[in-house]
Amino acid sequence: MADGGEDIQPLVCDNGTGMVKAGFAGDDAPRAVFPSIVVGRPRHTGVMVGMGQKDAYVGDEAQSKRGILTLKYPIEHGIVSNWDDMEKISHHTFYNELRVAPEEHPVLLTEAPLNPKANREKMTQIMFETFNVPAMYVLSRLRSCLSLYASGRTTGIVLDSGDGVSHTVPIYEGYALPHAILRLDLAGRDLTDGLMKILTERGYMFTTTATGMSYMKEKLAYVALVMSKSWRLPRARLLVEKNYELPDGQVITIGAVRGSGCPEVLFQPSMIGMESAGIHETTYNSIMKCDVDIRKDLYGNIVLSGGSTMFPGSCYASMSKEITALAPSSMKIKVVAPPERKYSVWIGGSILASLSTFQQMWISKGEYDESGPSIVHRKCF
């Protein structure tokens, strides 16, 4: 790393659709985890008089003021759609959460596979020109490799499902196979929206945002809800009643399904009117795009990653069952659900950025000044 300074701890930032995970290379877990759906501005002029009004609020502070702020979502389906707001999130990450001067630390960023090239260049430009970082690197296809490495494997297929997007990434002997990577715009936020829609059909009125719904979804860990005929329960067993208090004080009683754990929508997108393959079919289709000689290794190493695979009882059992039904009968199916998978991408990045062998991989400030933002395509994978 030409300009990075090897004695300085690199920063690792995993900017997801729903949450930002940030911290220092070499650490076991991120120091900061906060919502990335969170840049807020006053809805009405004058409503925050005397509250020390700012132009924008980020993270938990914006969320706490959601009743009087207009929340904005700078990342949609894993891709940055509002760069001004994304810049504010990065500023908040460095100065408020990690409390560091970014010009003193190399920065490792992650991005969704199949991210548009223009977005990669824009993020590179912001890091070097706005935050003056000494060096940086952007993980794309290699991002999913980290989840695989964290499980002790170098060959397998990673199903990464977060808040905004899901991906299947086949990896053989440490290398992602780009022709077989598939993207599915179905993830945690769709489950949240589905929950909100069904509760609205039941007659509940909300003053809270989808953020509150998201917390309820995670807390109750529903498989499916017995509130709408459009929501089928193919694997439902014991019904239980649970109460949940929304941030606005409203108490909702939900008939949740105990037994499975992973929301059925991920396997049956048609439940929310989406014409798409489920995560099991997407995983299968991704494997089928690979050479026939390596499919056995992929079927035997299906690794789950991301927050939307964390529901108790979880995608593990459902994925095993569904893939077994799709695959040849002679094929041995093994699904792996590492306990740390919610942060496996960040943890992998932390390990990678602290390796001595990685130091030559950084894009230095000098290289950026010489080649411009397009250098990210030559050096980052």
From Swiss-Prot:
One Pfam family from the record: Actin
EC number(s) given by UniProt: 3.6.4.-
Cell location: Cytoplasm, Cytoskeleton
Keyword ATP-binding appears in the UniProt entry: yes
Keyword match Zinc: no
Chief location: cytoplasm
Gene Ontology CC, one term: cytoplasm
GO MF, one annotated term: hydrolase activity
Keywords recorded for this protein, A-Z: ATP-binding, Cytoplasm, Cytoskeleton, Hydrolase, Nucleotide-binding
Name of the top EC class for this enzyme: hydrolase
InterPro entries hit by this protein: Actin, Actin/actin-like_CS, Actin_CS, ATPase_NBD
Catalytic activity: ATP + H2O = ADP + phosphate + H(+)
SMART domains documented for this protein: ACTIN (SM00268)
Disulfide bonding pattern of the chain: none
Protein role: Actins are highly conserved proteins that are involved in various types of cell motility and are ubiquitously expressed in all eukaryotic cells.
Family (UniProt): Belongs to the actin family.
Protein name, as recorded: Actin-2
